[in-house]
Every structure is written in structure tokens, then in C-alpha cells.
């Protein structure tokens, strides 16, 4: 504390302890201080809907005309199914049509007057006549399960196929194994929304009911939705069973082949229709092995079964069982038989194979008596085949034998064909029979059946015209056919051929079939026509054989699927087409002979490996050295060309890794950097010894690749922490009190000099230097604490008393000198070298405290008596020097694998205290002069105090109450002198008296 007492100016404020004695001289002033943050059913076989037009005519009147109408088909899709399959594509199926239903146009008259009548019945030639038979198969969320090669994880084991040896003379054998026998899965094929509807239909004006007019272009439509369980396999079967009055097809008999297609025309199941049991048995193809969640809908053309549903205007129960689901509906059937008409005909059916028209004509249903009956048939676009002996004449013995359906039970009729001569003319396009045969009159009734074959030379639609020339009139009837969809024609019984051959494993990859090479089982083969429409599909048997049968002359396409784990061999090697491979897709031509040369060869796709080594590159040169070891547990990922992960592994204890079972192709190898390691330099030297980096693109082409390496070394990291704290505190306190009282008596000289000098120097230097160099993986810890305290204490007491009597000289000299030097030097030097894996931490604390306290009290009293000289000199000198130097130097070098810890503490305390008291008393008697000078000097270079003291003088001095002009000062001086003299005299007397 700066409590050093100093003497003030005579006009300043006197120290507190003296204020009470000065109240009368100074006025005391007071001051106030205010102190103030986010299904087609293809009834394939090319069945068509034919429109039959029959026309019976009298020459006087026409009572009824039914115009031919174009047959149309509609597709009905269950709305509920669509809702369940919003993600699937639904498309119209390819139309495999059947021209089975006929549109009948007939004109008849019930007039009995004998007139000449002309009957015209025409039939239009239909080639591959078809019905509008369509199927829509909707498959939702299907998963392809085909045996096409799929991307597999390289760690899996390829599925092996056992193939039995084939006969060495295979090329001389054209037979294939029996079709795969499956299981009936009626319980696994589920049908819903089954319906039998009349397409078009005719409304009976009397009853208001819709009727099925079988000879007037009407057909029936069987519709349903279906789903197939995923457990169904190729070869499994299910059935459609039609009831007593209901069958597939139209006026054209159903084809034996009935296929079920998907929306793209691919065959889901191949059906065989058995007319004896009126049942179609479907066998699933490999389609169901390729897809899951198969569901769809179909619409199939159907017809009344004429042999059972025989009577017009009668309701028959049309029933069908699809799988295990049964549905029935009553349908009113009408064939349009005119019982009063002497001549009427109808198409009994159209043969599905040769498209021949099987006709039935009723003659003299009314049982009229004639003397002339000539029956003539004229064909346009058709011909009779006299050698076929299919022109039959039956005599009716029972009127009921004229059944309305025009399909009489001929076993109950009397065959009288041999009694008549059938005369063919006009290139077998006209047949004439004289039904009287020498009789003069007759009322006999006949049923005549004929077969008309299409004539290729015809370019019109064709028709069949009948006339019955009697003695009364000439009757006529005409049957014509309109081809709704149109197709090619067949000439007689067209011969069918086979196409196919063999799929084999080409073990030597030469593209040719060798005697020791075996067939491949289970390869999918698809047959298409020249327009790309799928006709059939099959799967190779255990000997690699396949075959498509029942094919006409033409050009076909055969597609082979690539079996899993195989690669197609080279195609068309050499000149022998019988033993080479024709590739994945080939064209085969059938021209009046089987074509068994369509082969395809495959070899097992070779598998390759890649990999090698991950090592610790201790010298960081990017090359594998013999002394460098592998790194265990490094994760390695393999991606294919699409960026899909197909394998992961980890390096073994020797740093080795590999991926096996790879096909030729492009790959990427990704190394996952181990923790704590750094990627070494890449591609620095030959490919099998250098590091290839964290991600490596590689192409495998018919070879393994074991050059994919990578190297790492330990990471170079350095942690260096240097803290340097330097704290230097220096306190210097110097108080000097000087008090001088002087009483002077007459005629006395008193001289008192008091000098008080206090010097305090405090010097504190703290140097802290920390250098830290660190290299890879090095941690160094250096702590340096430097503390320097310097206290300097100096006490000096000086006491001088001087009494002087008259005529005496008193001389008192008091010198007090106190020097205190405090020097503190602290040097701290720490060097630390450490190698890798070390932390470097350098803390340097330097604290220097220097306290210097110097107190100097100087008290001088002087009494002077008359005629005496008193000289009192008091010098007080206090010097305090405090010097504190603290140097802290810390150097830390660290290199890999080294721990270094350096602590340096430096503590220096220096106390310096200097007190100086000086007291001088001098008494003089009368006749003396008293002069008192008091000098107080203070030197504190570190912290000057003079300015502070001056501020205090200014702030604390009491205001003067008197005038400050020289005159008043002089007056006061003289008054004081006189008072002093008086007091000296009085003091002198008392002193003498005391003596």
C-alpha cells in the first residue's frame, strides 16, 4: 500500500492526525460523489366363325329374310381383377379364331300351288376359318423364373444338371422322349366370374326372351377369370368339362388343339380336346416355371351340341366345369327348321381339319305326293369327291327323324343311297339325283347328306345351291358363308410334318456335334410362324431332343433359351447343317418333308477367379518386398459392371483374398482401408507387385487375374501441444514520513536538515521458449513450470536527539543507508526425442512475483534556545532492487513409436523489505535561529507515485480561508516571528528555571 506519509505544502491539507489542530486556520470543505445481454383360348387349329347363309325360295313369294351379320367379339374383364392388378399390363390376346357359327339367310313359302321354284343355297369357302376367340391373360407382379442365365453371387455353387449319355447313332434317330407326365392340378387353378352369354342373340317378339339362333350367326361365349398357384409346374394338367348340351367351337367343330395364351401370345398351357368325352385337357408349358403369380381371363367361342340339343324353341342347360368350378345357365335354342318347307338345308358342321362343309338337306317334310322329284346340288367354290362315297341318301320312316338341329341319328334311318344314281358333272361341282327312280308317283321323304370340299381355284366366297324340281313346282335353297376373319385355304387332307432335333453340350467348343457329346435336358424351345407368332413351345428331354409335330409346309422360326451355366457355341461351323449349331435363333423350312436339322450347341461357361494380396508397406515404396507381411481382416468388395455387389470377403492371416466362379466380364474390386493405416503409392512398378489403390477396375477375358493388390502403411500423424505461461508480478511499496517540528526561542540559531531518499527498483524478466518438431505418429509431452517470487525487505531506523543550551553547538548527523538486491534467475531447458506413436505436449509456466516494500520514517524535532547553534542532519537512503529472470526453453522432437514426457519446474522467491525511520530532536535556547527544511524524495521507476500524490493533494487540501497576497503573507510572517521570539523567551525562562 502506498501509505507513505509526506509533508504537504503549507497551504495544502495537513495529514489527518494533524487536522484537529488546524481547524482554526483552514475551512473544511465537504464533497458529495454520486456513483453513479420428409387366357386366348385359342381354339387354335385356326378355327373360325363362319357365317352361314341359307336361302329357300318359291318363285312367287318370300316370307322371311335374315340378313347375314358380321360376327363380332367382345372382351369382358372382371373389374375386380383389374383393381387387384393395377401394376400389370393387360393386352388383347392374339386372335386365334374359329369360323364355327353360321349366319343363315333363308327365304321360304308355305304356298302349295304347283309352281316352278328355285332353291339357292350357297356356301362361302373359308380357309383356316376362325371364330373371334380371344383370351386376355393378366399377370401381376410376375417374377421371371426362367432358366435364362441370371446374375448370381459368385460364392454360390452353380446348379448341376445330370445328363444321360445319348446313343452314338443319334443322328439316325428322330424320336423324342414321351411328354412329361404331370399331376392334375384342378385344385390349383381357380376360376371366377364364369359366364355363358349369347353373342348377339335374337329376341322372341312373343315371349320377349333372348334366344340362341344357331343358323343365324349367333354364337355362345364362355367367359371366366382365373389364377394359377405358384406351385404348378410344367407338365401339370387341368381340365374343362363341357356338359351334355354345350361344346367348344361354333358351326365349325372344335380343333383338337386348344391352347391357352398370355397377353403377348406366349403359350401358357397346351390343350387337347376329346370329342368323345367333350373334355379339354390342358398341360402347362414351361411358362409356369418362368413366372409366378399368373392370373388372367379368357373368352371362348362355344356352341350348342346339336346331337343333344335338337329341338327348336327349347331351353337347354348349358353347363361347364372349369377345373373344379362348375357353372350352368339355361339357353333357348332355335335352328330355324321349317317343317312345311319341301326343301330346306343347313350346314351340320364344318370339319376343322379340311374345312369341308357337311351338309344336311330335308326333302319333302310335308310328305307331299309327287310324280317328279329331281334333286340337284350346284357348288360354287367347292367340289364333290366321288371317290369318298360321302353322298348319302336316307329314307325317312318316322317324321320325328327330321330333327330341328339337322343332325339326325342316321343309325335309325334307312340308307337307300345304292338305289339311286348320283350323276356328277361340271368338274364335280354339280350332282344330280332322280328321286323317282322309275316310280310314277311318290310321297317318300328323304334326308340327304353331302360333303363339299373347298376348291382352291375359287376366288369368290363360294356357296351351295339346292333345287327340288317337282311336277308341282321347283323349290330352291341356298347356303352361303361369309368369312368373318379370313385366312388361307387347305386343299384336301394336307399332310403334316415335323420339325426339331437336338440341343447338345459342345464340350470341345468346336461348334459341331461329336459322338461322345451329350444332349442337354430342360432347354426351352419356342416355335413361331413366319410372322413371329408363337405356335408352340416345348422343353428338351433327357437326351436333349425336342420336336414340333403337325406342321404344314412353310417357314418357321425356332428359338432356344440359354440354359443356366452355359454359353452358346459357335454357330454354322462347316458345311454339314445336320451336325452344326444353328445358334439361339434359327429358321427352318418345311417343304413336303420333316426338317430335323435345327440344332443348338452350348458349352459350360468357364468360371474364373481374381484376387491376390493386401500387404503392409513398411518402407512406403508402393511395392511388395519379400520382408513385408500381409494384413489380415481387410474387407474386399466385388462389384459387377452395373455396380451391383456380387461378393465380399476378408483377407486371411497372410493378407490373401480371392473371388471364384466368375464369368468373363468387367468388375470392380474395392478395398476398405483398415483403421490407422494409410494408402501407399499406387501403380509404381510391374502389375503383380505394385499397389493398385482402393478401387480397381478389372476385365476378365478367359483367364484368372491374381494381380489385384493393395498396400498400406501406418498413418503419419503428429500431435504437438505447447503451452507457455509467463506471469510476472512486481509490487513495489515505498512510504516515507517526514515530520519536522521546530520551536525557536530568541537569539537562537537552529539548523535541521532531514533528507529522506527511497529508491525501489523491481525488475522481473520471464522468457519462455518452446520449440516442438514432431514426425509421424509421435506424441511428446513436455511440461515446464517456472515460478519466480522476489521479496525484498529493508528496515532502517534512525533516531537522533539533540539538546542544546545557550551558547552551545549541537551537531547531529544520522545517515541510514539500506541497499537490498534480490536477483533470481531460473533457467529451464527440456529436450525430448521420441519415436513414433507419441504425443508431444509442452506446457511452460513462468511465474515471477517481486514484492518490494520500503518504509522510511523521518522525524526531526528541533528546540533551540538563545544563543545556540543546533545543526541536525538526517539522511535516510533506502534502495531496493529486485531482479527476477526466468528463462524456460523446451524443445521437443518426436519420431515414430516414442513417448516422451518432460516436466520442468522452476521456482524463485525473492523478498525485499526496506524500512527507514529517522528521528532527530534538537533543542536550542534563546537567541537562536531556527530553520527547518524537510525534503522527502521517492524514486520508483516501476510505478511512479508522484502523480497520484499530487492528485490527492489537490483533492484533499482544505481551502484557504485567508488572503493569498504577498502583503498578508508578510504580515503573517512577521507576526509569526514575533510570536516565536516570545515563545522562545518564555521557553528559555522555563528551561532555566527547571535547570
Swiss-Prot record:
GO CC, any one term: extracellular region
Compartments, as annotated in UniProt: Secreted, Cell wall
Region annotation (Ligand binding A region) ranges: 51-495
Domain CNA-B intervals: 496-606, 607-717
Stored InterPro entries: Adhesin_Fg-bd_dom_2, Adhesion_dom_sf, Fibrogen-bd_dom1, Ig-like_fold, LPXTG_anchor, SDr-like, Sdr_B, SDR_Ig
Residues that bear Pentaglycyl murein peptidoglycan amidated threonine: 961
Composition skew (Low complexity), residue ranges: 960-975
GO biological process entries: cell adhesion
Motif window: YSIRK-G/S signaling motif: 21-32
Short motif (LPXTG sorting signal): ranges: 958-962
Sequence ranges of Acidic residues compositional bias: 685-695, 712-934
Role: Cell surface-associated calcium-binding protein which plays an important role in adhesion and pathogenesis. Mediates interactions with components of the extracellular matrix such as host NRXN1 to promote bacterial adhesion.
Family: Belongs to the serine-aspartate repeat-containing protein (SDr) family.
Full protein name: Serine-aspartate repeat-containing protein C
